[in-house]
């Protein structure tokens, strides 16, 4: 079943694994595993501050403490001047836990959308370098500058190229609402508490990886097929992308000749755990 030509996305919901295939080669992997997921936002509590290694350990509700390096803490000055023991702090997971190591977290929150990435604590506007037209870059920057609140930052994603002002505005409003919900929850909850979790694997993969070069999306459940079709239709991307339900007897990853790579990744994770 392996296709050496087309660019496709393979979503094995049964295994919580997805792969982006470009010109017959796996270009990217998405894996949904464990209780702590990349992109999670937590209301955490500072437990230990270690100036000698310029880091702090924060409680995010897991059996392993979150690791917060000084460079990932907003503001100027020494780490011990910015953080205090038992302090409540909003952090985001930038690296999932591996083996005996807990998650790495940051206070520089980023919320990805379809066309934009909201950076609530980092003012400014940055446009993807993959958008090469100076005119289009200026147009997008002007639109975002008019729409965004003062004090927040926005990254304009490659997918924003050619999009209307209304579509960009809608995306920004969704992200701002998410951030407002995070702040409201942080004010009312006690740490450790999960404040926000990014969309499920299927939605995330389509949002992050699906573009005008995608020719096919292969899924392994009828439910996933229906969801993908609905998402593409809502995003007006359903005309050029073929959505296929795999019905073979062997697992989808095996049929697509991707399973060997997942085994290698699992072995590497075990090595990291033992190291």
Language-model features and meaning:
Residues 1-275:
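DE-rich acidic low-complexity regions and acidic surface loops
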């Amino acid at each position: 079943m392996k296709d050496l030509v087309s660019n496709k996305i393979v979503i094995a919901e049964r295994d919580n694994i997805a792969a982006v295939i470009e010109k017959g080669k796996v270009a990217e992997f998405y894996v949904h595993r464990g209780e702590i997921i990349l992109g999670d936002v937590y209301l955490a509590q500072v437990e230990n501050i270690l100036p000698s290694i310029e880091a702090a350990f924060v409680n995010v509700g897991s059996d392993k403490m979150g690791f917060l390096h000084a460079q990932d803490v907003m503001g100027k000055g020494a780490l011990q001047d910015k953080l205090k023991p038992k302090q409540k702090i909003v952090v985001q997971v930038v690296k999932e836990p591996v083996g005996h190591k807990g998650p790495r977290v940051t206070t520089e929150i980023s919320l990805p959308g379809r066309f934009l990435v909201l950076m609530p604590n980092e003012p400014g506007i940055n446009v993807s370098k993959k958008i090469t037209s100076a005119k289009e870059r200026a147009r997008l920057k002007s639109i975002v500058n008019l729409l965004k609140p003062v004090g927040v930052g926005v990254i304009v994603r490659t997918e924003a190229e050619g999009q209307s002002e209304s579509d960009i505005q809608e995306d920004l409003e969704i992200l701002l609402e998410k951030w407002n919900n995070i702040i409201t929850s942080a004010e009312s909850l006690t740490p450790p508490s999960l404040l926000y979790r990014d969309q499920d694997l299927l939605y995330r993969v389509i949002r992050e990886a699906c573009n005008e070069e995608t020719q096919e999306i292969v899924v392994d459940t009828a439910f996933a097929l229906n969801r993908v079709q609905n998402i593409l239709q809502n995003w007006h991307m359903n005309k050029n992308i073929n959505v296929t339900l795999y019905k073979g007897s062997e697992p989808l990853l095996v049929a697509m000749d991707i399973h060997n790579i997942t085994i290698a990744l699992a072995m590497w994770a075990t090595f990291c755990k033992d190291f």
